[in-house]
Amino acid sequence: MELSQYHQILSLLNNFSNKDKISVIECLDSISELRKQMSVLFNKLLKVALKNRNLPMVKFVCDNLEKIDNKAITLAAKYNCLEILKYLHEKGLDTTNHNYSALSWAARNNDFKMVEYLQHQGSDIRANDDEALRWAALSGCLEMVEYLQTQGCDVRNRNDFAIKYAARNGHFKLVRYLHSQGSDIRTDDDYALRWAARNGHLEIVKYLHSKGCNIHAYGDSAIKWASMGGYLEIVEYLHGVGCDIRIDNDYPIRWAASNGHLEVVEYLFSQGCDIGADNNYALMWAKKNGHDDVVEYIVLLKLLKLY
């Protein structure tokens, strides 16, 4: 709204008559629209302030907002600022709102002080099927997981989510701890081993295999995914313990080539994989994806009549 519009409104209100009724209504509508726009602007500013953990800016914005969105509490927890979270709570925001997601973020960030504060304010440590513990496991926060377990959280909730994602994200110490606490390492078709292989976590792959996980689960997906990701040591290990490197029409070498993993391609070829499988899939996709070193290697093999 322009400054001239404010003067127009003041003039109309000071000299109001029936003939000015429509003009006044239009001006009031403009004010209403402006307030909406300002509210949107201040809410955007609040998110920026929270992300930057800027308490003075948070206070300024809150002082200029008629109503503060309760999601601000969750964002304060997400961005790991207890001081701001306390301030927002003092302003009347509910720490237990939005399915206790503030507590889950505090646990994921390994922030014990915030977790304890939220507990003291009434947050349910076991809300959403032990989401706090599950998120802590996702981030590899071993001590937080141990603490939450002492508070009654179940490490096996949601189909052993904790150990599956601890393995997937490479948190070896946590994987061992959760296994010692009764988590099922083989749940969901050996998800833990398969995703550890996919993400390159050799130590976890070895551990899980030693504890009875099936390296062939889900159609030998462990070696297929490790090849696709270029994790040579995992490919070598899995091949050494019996995985079929020629599974699904030489899937491992085809996808290693497609993704540009020359060392894996060289190893798999040396172990008997058919680099020309599926109508020269490896060469075709290495070319399409711009992996010149792989293309040169395959062309050389062809020139030497090695396949």
From Swiss-Prot:
Transmembrane segments: none annotated. Disulfide bonds: none annotated. The keyword Zinc-finger does not apply. ANK repeats lie at residues 41-67, 68-97, 98-127, 129-157, 158-187, 188-217, 219-247, 248-277, 279-307. Keywords: ANK repeat, Repeat. It holds the Pfam family Ank_2. The keyword Hydrolase does not apply. This is Putative ankyrin repeat protein L59.
